[in-house]
UniProtKB/Swiss-Prot annotation:
UniProt keyword Iron, yes or no: no
Induction (record text): By stress conditions e.g. heat shock.
Segments of skewed composition (Basic and acidic residues): 612-627
Family to which this protein belongs: Belongs to the heat shock protein 70 family.
Record field: compositional bias (Polar residues): 602-611
Region (Disordered): 602-627
Name of this protein: Chaperone protein DnaK
HAMAP family: DnaK
Family matches, as PANTHER family: HEAT SHOCK PROTEIN 70KDA
Lineage: superkingdom: Bacteria
Species this protein is from: Rickettsia felis (strain ATCC VR-1525 / URRWXCal2) (Rickettsia azadi)
Length: 627
């Protein structure tokens, strides 16, 4: 087995590392840099990757693609994609399958393809350093990436000619690098604010075991959003001073973006900077120049709400893990944005401790991926990584209820089965609809996919036993199967949503679940109460058909009256009334049971006496004296 490389496929920059002996090492690229800009450009039928692509972006904005990670696995109609359309100079287009793709040099590319070009650069960088062909890799993704996004990332690896041995969460990879070859036991938080995404994970590290307790995040929050705030500020200031709107000028936008990113970085180490962009545009009076003094205080005011948005996921992650901020013994900062003093200040304020700055925030994720590659390659031993799935997974059941099979923050890989049945008599097929989210009703969650299980033998409802199995692999990718236990017929599917789950949808699911918890609970309770009552009505009617002639008219009348009352209650939306009538019918049914049991016992006693009488035999006998 050859070397397994670790790749941090970032929104803004990417990085590749490999195990050298017992230590992970970041590999320099052809330009002598340890990180590579995640930028692709198409110019004169030539494809440029990394720094060369970034250098020509100002003169070729329409054909220069950056931050494509924010589009990967997303549908074109996703609100976040719509938001990005107004911020980037290149075209985002709708693919035939509904996904968001990009257009450059008169060609359409999927985000997986663009990502593959970056991965190829990482692959070549490693091959040049190692002097051998590289075919296997561990690739990192944001912890809050959904199934479609993980699948699309894995596809990117395949396009790049890499066998992706493992998809690993970025905060987990950072924790691996932080805790590698450290013997102490600690509970840590990894705060990862990168170029396009934010993640926070809570982990317990002890004797080589890295156990993720919870994770949370926002897959559309990062340095790109900070840059956009600065860019919009520059546009507003220039428009106020000159009356010219630069937002419709792709060339000016690209220059403004570069200036915004540069100013943001400078303000991490200085209190003020000058933004000078000569000849930014021109009008009838001649060329116009942009010259603005920009302070750290102004920047902090512009992005204060973005920084604050990272705190709620931290709070939720701690809650899910069952910890308080004071339980965290170390806060590890990951991602270039954590160099910003205001971000560090917010982290310190929330966790009540100075964050750990002993790791390189741009390289630590790739180092962790390389360590995981070493584990899979058996170069590294005595390390056990236990990661989690970020959102609950389940299916839609009778009444539209979302029945969870695997809860969020469940350790992966994980496999869970549950037996369901049919809702109608002689039902020969069932549709399994797979959802992801935190709401109690399936329709309020995200449909990941669906499939049919056909050929179920005719039987009364509730009789067939259909076993549904959810299997999440170590990459966080979902596999679902349904099997009719009587016929042995089985249907399996790897869930591949056409457009993936949007970040806004995921966040909204959790927020809505909290805001609408009472409403969801009542609705779920009503449906479950109705389902139970409906089943009781069905079984009671069946009992009356089969044993009604054995009941007295008084007993039968009482049951029929209770049955009619429950049927009437089922027409309403009153859960308490349905429960009351269900209890009444249950009590009436118990009296039937007592009567039937008594009759059956008497019948058995009578039969036993008859059998005993039949066994009595007359016999002659003779006394024999003992001699």
């Amino acid at each position: 087995m050859g070397k397994v490389i670790g790749i941090d496929l970032g929104t803004t920059n990417s990085c590749v590392a490999v195990m050298e002996g017992k230590e992970p090492k970041v590999i320099d690229n052809a330009e002598g840099e340890r990180t590579t800009p995640s930028i692709i450009a198409f110019a004169n039928s030539e494809r440029l990757v990394g720094q060369p692509a970034k250098r020509q972006a100002v003169t070729n904005p329409r054909n220069t693609i950056y931050a494509v990670k924010r589009l990967i696995g997303r549908n074109f109609t996703d609100p976040m994609v719509r938001k990005d359309q107004g911020l980037v100079p290149y075209n985002i287009v709708k693919a035939d399958n509904g996904d968001a793709w990009v257009e450059a040099d008169n060609n359409k590319y999927s985000p997986s393809q663009i990502s593959a070009f970056i991965l190829q650069k990482m692959k070549e960088t490693a091959e040049n350093y190692l002097g051998e062909k590289v075919t296997q890799a561990v690739i990192t993704v944001p912890a809050y990436f959904n199934d479609a996004q993980r699948q699309a990332t894995k596809d990117a690896g395949k396009i790049a000619g890499l066998e992706v041995l493992r998809i690993i969460n970025e905060p987990t990879a950072a924790a691996l690098a932080y805790g590698f070859e450290k013997s102490s036991s600690k509970t840590i938080a990894v705060y990862d604010l990168g170029g396009g995404t934010f993640d926070v994970s809570i982990l317990e590290i002890s004797d080589g075991v890295f156990e993720v307790k919870s994770t949370n995040g926002d897959t559309f929050l990062g340095g790109e959003d900070f840059d956009t705030r600065i860019l919009n500020h520059l546009i507003d200031v220039f428009k106020k001073d000159s009356g010219i709107d630069l937002s419709k000028d792709p060339l000016a936008l690209q220059r403004l973006k570069e200036a915004a990113e540069k100013a943001k970085k400078e303000l991490s180490s200085t209190s003020a900077t000058d933004i000078n962009l000569p000849y930014i545009t021109a009008d009838s009076t001649g060329p116009k120049h942009l010259n603005i003094k920009f302070t750290r205080a102004e920047l902090e005011k512009l992005v204060d709400d973005l920084i604050e948005k990272t705190i709620e996921p931290c709070r939720q992650a701690l809650k899910d893990a069952g910890f308080k901020p004071t339980d965290i013994q170390e806060v590890v900062l990951v991602g270039g944005m954590t160099r910003m003093p205001k971000v560090q200040e917010a982290v310190k304020k929330f966790f009540g401790r100075e964050p750990h700055k002993g790791v390189n925030p741009d390289e630590v994720v790739a180092l962790g991926a390389a360590i995981q590659g070493g584990v899979l390659n058996k170069e590294v031993t005595d390390i056990l990584l236990l990661d989690v799935t970020p959102l609950s997974l389940g299916i839609e059941t009778l009444g539209g209820v979302f029945t969870r099979l695997i809860d969020r923050n469940t350790t992966i890989p994980s496999k869970k089965s549950q037996v369901f049945s049919t809702a109608d008599d002689n039902q020969h097929a069932v549709t399994i609809r797979v959802f992801q989210g935190e709401r109690e009703m399936a329709k309020d969650n995200k449909l990941l996919g669906q499939f049919n299980l056909e050929g179920i033998p005719p039987a009364p409802r509730g009789v067939p036993q259909i076993e549904v199995t959810f299997d999440i692999d170590a990459n966080g990718i979902v596999h679902v199967s349904a099997k009719d236990k009587a016929s042995g017929k089985e249907q399996k599917v790897t869930i591949q949503a056409s457009g993936g789950l949007s970040d806004s949808e995921i966040e909204q699911m959790v927020k809505d679940a909290e805001h609408n918890a009472d409403e969801d609970k009542k609705r779920k309770e009503l449906i479950e109460t109705k389902n139970a009552a409906d089943s009781l009505v069905y079984s009671t009617e069946k009992t009356l058909r089969e044993y009604g002639d054995k009941l007295s008219s008084e007993e039968k009348g009482a049951v029929e009256e209770a049955l009619a009352s429950l049927k009437s209650a089922l027409e309403s939306e009153d859960a308490s009334l349905i429960k009351e009538k269900t209890n009444n019918l249950t009590a009436a049914n118990m009296k039937i049971g007592e009567t039937m049991y008594k009759a059956q016992t008497e019948n058995q006693h009578s039969e036993a006496n008859t059998v005993n009488d039949e066994k009595v035999v007359d016999a002659d006998f003779q006394d024999v004296d003992k001699k």
